[in-house]
Curated annotation (Swiss-Prot):
Cross-link (Cyclopeptide (Gly-Asn)): 43-71
Biological process (GO), any one: defense response
Natural source organism: Chassalia chartacea
Pro-peptide region(s): 24-42, 72-78
InterPro entries named among the record's database cross-references: Cyclotide (IPR005535), Cyclotide_sf (IPR036146)
Free-text domain note: The presence of a 'disulfide through disulfide knot' structurally defines this protein as a knottin.
Processing and modification events after translation: This is a cyclic peptide.
Domain of life from the UniProt record: Eukaryota
SUPFAM superfamilies from the UniProt entry: Cyclotides (SSF57038)
Disulfide-bond pairs as recorded: 46-60, 50-62, 55-68
Keywords per UniProt: Disulfide bond, Knottin, Plant defense, Signal
Role of this protein: Probably participates in a plant defense mechanism.
Name listed for the protein in its UniProt record: Chassatide C4
Residues in the signal sequence: 1-23
Amino acid sequence: MAKFATQLFLLTASVVMLEVQSSIVIMQDPDLGRKLIMNPANGASCGETCFTGICFTAGCSCNPWPTCTRNGLNPESI
């Protein structure tokens, strides 16, 4: 029984370590600084136009018209 408990502990510890490593990788995004300082009114292009006043890409808005842009401060764009 002690051997099983040790193996279970090691398995759990390895899963926790993988979670910690993946969260560190996310925080080291080289584009994060660029995305955070983008002007919300003049963000990155979403690749579509909004002649009808609507953008179909998630996280994009029709500002400035007629180009859909993504707000660099929205969590969806990060």
